[in-house]
A protein has these predicted regions:
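Glycine-rich flexible loops
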Residues: 1-397
Length: 397
C-alpha cells in the first residue's frame, strides 16, 4: 500500500468510526502501517468530519518522529508499540467506545470474552493507567501486549485500542469488544445475584442502593419534557419539547416551566456558557438520585467536564454556582445540565457525563470504584482548557 492510499484509508476509517459511534469529535485516533518503519496517523485535535488525506501524518515506528507542520496524534506512541510488537498488524484504532470505557473504570484487570469473540483471544487485558500521551501509558500497552493474544486492549480510565491485519479486522475487534464488555458486566451481575436474567434498569436500581446518600433538604421538581437552551443577544431561546420560546434575561413570563429559572441563572452567572442541554439519560437520572459528587472515572471527563460535578437540590443560584468550575451539574433526581461554548461542546459534555455515570453504576456492581487522582484530574483539566480546546477551536477556523 502506498502512503497516499494509506492516508485515504485512514480518512475514510475516521468517518466510519464517527458513524459507528465508536468515537466522537476529536476523541480517539486511527493509523495504518505503510512499511516496516512507518505508519500514518490522524492529527492531534482535528474533527474527523473535516479531515483530508493531506492532514494525515507519517510517523516513525522507532522514535515517533514526523515531518511537516501538522502535529500527529498525541497517542502515536501506543500505535507504535503495537506495530513494533505485531509486524503483521496493518491497522490500529484507539476508541472511547462506551462499554469498553465503562469497564476501564471498573475493578477488572482482565476477563475472558468467550468463544463468540475469537478476535479478542482468550483474555482481554486492561492495561495499567497512564496519563494520555505519556511514556507510562506506552509501557502499560507494551506489558499488556505480552499478556493478550487478541486484537484489543482496554486502557484503564481511558478507552480501548483495537488492531488487526486489515482495517476490517480492526473494526470487527472494536465491535466485538463492545459486545463482550457488555456481556461480561451483565454476566457478573447475574452471577452475583443468582438470577437467570435481568435488564439494565435492574442493574441501575441495584447500583443506586449501594451508592445513594440520604438527602433531607428541599428538592426541586421539574416535569418532563426537560428543557434545552441557547444564549441569544437579548436573552436565550428555551426549547421545551417541540416548542422554542424567546426569554428575556431576568424576566420570566408566567407559564414557563420551572426549569427556565435555572437556565436564566446559569446564563447570568456564567458568561462563557452559550448552550445548555438537559440529560435525562437513565444513567444520569440514576446518579442524580444518589446525592453524590461525581468524580472523573475517565480521562475525557476530567479534561472536558471537570474535576468534579456536584449534585444540587437547591435554588437556581446554587445550580449556577456549581458550574463555575465544571461544565455540568447534577440536578437532584432530574439528571444533569450539560453546558458549553458551542452546541458541539455541550453535546460532548452530555455524552461524557452519561458515560461517566454508566461507568460509576456498572463499576459499583463489579467492585470498588476508584476515581482518577485529584492531581491527575486537575492536570488534564488545565492542559485541556489551556491547550487542546484552543487547538480544536483554531482547527475549526
Amino acid at each position: 500500500m502506498t502512503e497516499q492510499q494509506a492516508k485515504e484509508l485512514v480518512v475514510a476509517a475516521g468517518l466510519r468510526l464517527v458513524e459507528s459511534g465508536l468515537i466522537a469529535r476529536t476523541w480517539g485516533n486511527v493509523s495504518c502501517r505503510i512499511s516496516d518503519t512507518q505508519f500514518v496517523i490522524t492529527p492531534s485535535g482535528r474533527d474527523y468530519l473535516s479531515l483530508a488525506a493531506a492532514d494525515i501524518v507519517p510517523v516513525s515506528i522507532d522514535d515517533l518522529s514526523y515531518t511537516g507542520h501538522i502535529k500527529p496524534s498525541g497517542e502515536r506512541g501506543i500505535h507504535a508499540e503495537i506495530y513494533r510488537y505485531h509486524p503483521e498488524v496493518q491497522f490500529v484504532i484507539h476508541t472511547h467506545q462506551e462499554y469498553a470505557s465503562v469497564l476501564s473504570a471498573a475493578d477488572v484487570a482482565q476477563f475472558a470474552p468467550g468463544p463468540n469473540y475469537p478476535l479478542l483471544g482468550g483474555s482481554v487485558v486492561c492495561a495499567a493507567y497512564g496519563l494520555p500521551g505519556t511514556k507510562t501509558l506506552r509501557r502499560s500497552i507494551r506489558t499488556a501486549l505480552q499478556t493478550t493474544g487478541g486484537g484489543a486492549i482496554i486502557m484503564k480510565h481511558h478507552g480501548a485500542v483495537c488492531f488487526g491485519k486489515t482495517e476490517e479486522e480492526a473494526f470487527l475487534a472494536a465491535s466485538d469488544l463492545e459486545l463482550a464488555c457488555r456481556d461480561y458486566i451483565m454476566a457478573r451481575y447475574l452471577q452475583q445475584k443468582q438470577l437467570p436474567q435481568a435488564d439494565d434498569d435492574q442493574l441501575r436500581r441495584c447500583a443506586l442502593t449501594m451508592l445513594a446518600k440520604p438527602h433531607s433538604g428541599k428538592s426541586n421538581y421539574f416535569a418532563p419534557p426537560y428543557c434545552n437552551s441557547e444564549r441569544t443577544a437579548d436573552g436565550f431561546l428555551l426549547q421545551v419539547g417541540d416548542k422554542q420560546l424567546k426569554v428575556a434575561p431576568g424576566r420570566l413570563p408566567a407559564g414557563l416551566p420551572p426549569e427556565a429559572a435555572l437556565h436564566d441563572a446559569i446564563y447570568k452567572a456564567n458568561p462563557d456558557i452559550q448552550y445548555i442541554l438537559h440529560s435525562d439519560a437513565p444513567d444520569a437520572i440514576a446518579v442524580s438520585q444518589a446525592n453524590l459528587t461525581l468524580r472523573p472515572l475517565l480521562d475525557d471527563f476530567a479534561q472536558i467536564v471537570g474535576t468534579q460535578v456536584k449534585t444540587v437540590f437547591g435554588p437556581p443560584a446554587k445550580v449556577a454556582g456549581a458550574l463555575k468550575h465544571a461544565s455540568a451539574v447534577l440536578l437532584g433526581n432530574h439528571g444533569a445540565l450539560c453546558c458549553g461554548a458551542t452546541a458541539g461542546d455541550a453535546a460532548a459534555v452530555k455524552m461524557i457525563v452519561e458515560k461517566n455515570c454508566k461507568a460509576l453504576l456498572c463499576g459499583t456492581l463489579l467492585g470498588k470504584v476508584t476515581p482518577i487522582s485529584k492531581v491527575d484530574s486537575l492536570l488534564m483539566r488545565v492542559v485541556y482548557l489551556k491547550k487542546y480546546s484552543k487547538q480544536i477551536s483554531a482547527n475549526k477556523g
